Amino acid sequence: MKTNMRKADVKKQIVALALAAVFALPGAALAADTKFPLTPNSGSMEFDHLKRQYEIPNFRIGGKYNLDADPETWRNGGEGGTTLESLGAAPLKVAYIAVGTPRRNDRGEIINAVIVNTFYSGDSTNMYNFWYDGQPGNGFSGGAVVGPGKAIDTNRYYVVFLDALGLWGTSKPSDGLGRKFPSYSYFDMVQTNYRLLRDHLKIAQVEVATGVSMGATQSWVWGVMYSPSGFVKAIMPIGGTTASDGDDPIGAWTFLLAQSAIESDPKWRATNGNYYHLPVDQHPKQGLQFMWSRLQLTGFTFPVRSATPWDRIEREVFYWEPKGNQSAAWIARVKNEDPVDFWYRNDSGFNYNINKDLKRIKARTLVVHVDTDMWLIVDNARKSAKAVDGAVFASFSDPTAHYAVFKAPNVLKDTIKSFVDNTFTTSLPGIAGASSGGGGAQAAVEKPAGLAK
């Protein structure tokens, strides 16, 4: 009986965590007019007062980056890109939250920065809530990650939480351009934030570039673009990918279906996504609800989904004509989200593939992944790690699948802290006995030859 009670308690905890993931991510009410921007400045508005913005005039979005050229040639974006000013809009803006203790060289430049790139639907306020010490979202991550004495120690590092081009505090389609907004790439996300770090915050080098999910993907790109010059000293992608085109069939399939869900909305089809002239209550929000429902089906392991009571599940199941609590989770969520913003976010991944460029990475590299991730398969992450000289690969299993990326720094606490602090030894801490509390995760670390670099 005692064992059964424990199993039941664990099951309840897992179901509760799965539901928490849905509601922990951005969601707030939007006024019924069509004033721009259509979406808020922050994913977690309670932390909006901490966010700062920076303008980058005449930045070319959507251009081609020649990685063999001097990085100064991409200072204002890739060749052939489009500036927002040329479309009659304000200059490009980026946003961030900074905490910690800056240490400066004799030129007054910061030399101890750690950057935290944001995930697919989030921003700096979300990552601050989940990871910074003492915030209400810490429980979602199994505890704080950033703060005094934490894995990323703010007594030792200057930590910058970054927004990513296309959502929340950065320039985005829902600022008013809609489908006229230039298509952007992960290279654009990184380059705009490089300009923020270098020009505005006067950061001379980044000790570690990290992030979860799409934030991890950006960390990979930081390594490709800015480790050869020494600007980025180490990268720590947690649950990211180095390709989301045909080199990753499951990932590409998943997000192509997500894109198709947006486009399936009759209001989208009637306007071809050009609907900003309509009242907000006539925008194609159901397609966005459909997208989230599709993604969430495999956002957690099937045992988690199977253990969730139907009266809770149907809040996450998409219905074209919902009744009662059907689709309630997504109806609430998309009130402050715009379908065009997410259409562009999805589009940015379909042509993304840096596998052939991984050899450019000269940074210390720790690749962290969740073995049970059903969106971004662990075998692909392992292959990417093997392509980088001296990279270390660490993984663990968790029933919350992809969403376990947020708790990874606490599951692999010793390994990650020693990597961040550059105190790795041959014993590689955290190999045995690591667990995620109720999740029963088992951690493993692999050390290829040539770690010391």
PLM segments and residue spans:
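Catalytic-loop region of hydrolases
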Residues: 32-113, 428-453
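N-terminal cap/lid subdomain of alpha/beta-hydrolase-fold enzymes
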Residues: 97-174
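Cap/lid segment of the alpha/beta-hydrolase catalytic domain
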Residues: 142, 146, 150-200, 248-279
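Conserved hydrolase catalytic core segment
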Residues: 205-209, 213-249
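Alpha/beta-hydrolase-fold enzymes
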Residues: 231-332
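Short beta-strand/loop motif that positions the catalytic acidic residue
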Residues: 361, 367-369
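Conserved alpha/beta-hydrolase "acid-adjacent" motif
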Residues: 374-380
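Catalytic histidine-centered segment of alpha/beta-hydrolase-like enzymes
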Residues: 399-410
